[in-house]
Amino acid sequence: MKDSLIIVSGGMDSITLLYDKKDEIALGVSFDYGSNHNAREIPYAAEHCRRLGIKHITINLDFIHEYFKSSLLEGAEAIPEGHYADDNMKSTVVPFRNGIMLSIAIGIAESNGLQKVLIANHGGDHAIYPDCRPAFIDAIDKAATEGTYNNCKVVAPYTNISKTDIARIGKALGIDYSETWSCYKGEEVHFGKCGTCVERREALAEAGIEDKTQYKV
């Protein structure tokens, strides 16, 4: 039964969830909030939804770029290099991003008679992003249930697994990860040394997947 909406960025995690739950998904939603990499990743989200016959929409959140502070919104040169869990990567946090996107997605889901909102946060996000942690997901799920007539649910099946685990799921599903985007710098090709690139490389290697991604370094 197609009773779900998915927040789909075009990155490894959400594309894996898209294919993992394709038989349940009626609508894919991407958010353009003016980050360095939105223009690179959203086309992948749209294309994968098209291939699966799932309606896709993009919602513009320009106010985030105008009023919020994050290196993710300040140009490629502002993105720090290093491992995803390093303290300097906290500069890439867009405050309450998932809370904002989930709130909008919950409203869209109820408006379209859908029961669930899917999001692909994972265990590797916990160190940096408060709105990816289990306590937050539990809280916003409860808020969604209490705040909608149809008792909409927030479903985040990857919350307590690693990106490597997600890559293994994708491998079993036959996903070509070269048709996803991770790099926060948002240039012509993946940079290779920012936190998301490092994490991507590690996950693919640990999952035994040939990495066909083109990296600058």
Which residues are covered by each model-predicted region?
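Poly-acidic low-complexity segments
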Residues: 60-63, 176, 190, 211
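Short cysteine/histidine-rich metal-coordination sites, predominantly Zn2+-binding motifs
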Residues: 186-187, 209-217
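Short Cys/His-rich "knuckle" micro-motifs
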Residues: 204-207
